[in-house]
């Protein structure tokens, strides 16, 4: 599956892309990343494999990535997901989670993120899933981006205690 948005080409991520994806991840978040996802892309790949992951290319160079998963809601143990299922059980039997997204700094603001999210959302819809992203409340840039993409804040907030 390949999608083009102006000069941005989006395709499924492969194992051969990992080196370039890890370079983007380290460029954005350093070796000790924590923004929304607490571990490196390498670790994500080792746990989840390719999942529903995409890369964006401009002139043959990988300039961004999106990693996600699509899961059946009835298999989820989360009360949040059960609540969502009860409200929309027949319409959305699955959830497509955007787990990680990263765009090289020099290509941010050039529709790369939009192309990646659109590709993931299309795949989610084909699978009968609603698309969801969990982000840190303090990540104003990602929050604005998701709002521009048509995402709406949902009613729950997660609290955590060490």
Please name every model-derived segment.
Residues 6-23, 34:
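A short beta-loop-alpha structural element at the N-terminal edge
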Residues 114, 126, 137-155:
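Conserved active-site alpha-helix within GNAT-family acetyltransferase domains
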Residues 67-100:
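Conserved acyl-donor/pantetheine-binding loop and adjacent beta-alpha core of acyl/acetyltransferases
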Residues 105-108, 132-143, 160:
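Conserved beta-strand-loop-alpha-helix junction that forms the acyl-donor binding cleft
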Residues 32-59, 67-73, 87:
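Active-site rim helix/loop that mediates acceptor-substrate recognition in acyltransferases
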Residues 103, 109-122:
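Conserved acetyl-CoA-binding loop-helix of GNAT-fold acetyltransferases
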Residues 95-96, 124-137:
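Conserved GNAT acetyl-CoA-binding A-motif
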Residues 8, 60-65, 96:
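Glycine-rich phosphate/pyrophosphate-binding loop shared by adenosine-nucleotide-utilizing enzymes
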């Amino acid at each position: 599956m390949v999608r083009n948005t102006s000069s941005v080409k989006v395709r499924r991520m492969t194992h051969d892309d990992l080196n370039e994806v890890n370079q983007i991840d380290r460029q954005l978040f350093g070796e000790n990343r924590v923004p929304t996802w607490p571990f490196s892309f390498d670790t994500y790949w080792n746990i989840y494999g390719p999942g529903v992951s995409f890369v964006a290319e401009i002139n043959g160079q990988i300039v961004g990535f999106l990693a996600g998963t699509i899961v059946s809601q009835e298999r989820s143990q989360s009360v949040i997901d059960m609540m969502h299922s009860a409200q929309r059980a027949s319409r959305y039997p699955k959830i497509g989670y955007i787990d990680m997204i990263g765009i090289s700094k020099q290509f941010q603001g050039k529709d790369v993120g939009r192309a990646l999210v659109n590709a993931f959302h299309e795949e989610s819809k084909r699978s009968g899933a609603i698309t969801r992203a969990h982000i840190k409340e303090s990540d104003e840039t990602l929050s604005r981006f998701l709002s521009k993409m048509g995402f709406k804040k949902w009613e729950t907030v997660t609290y955590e205690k060490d």
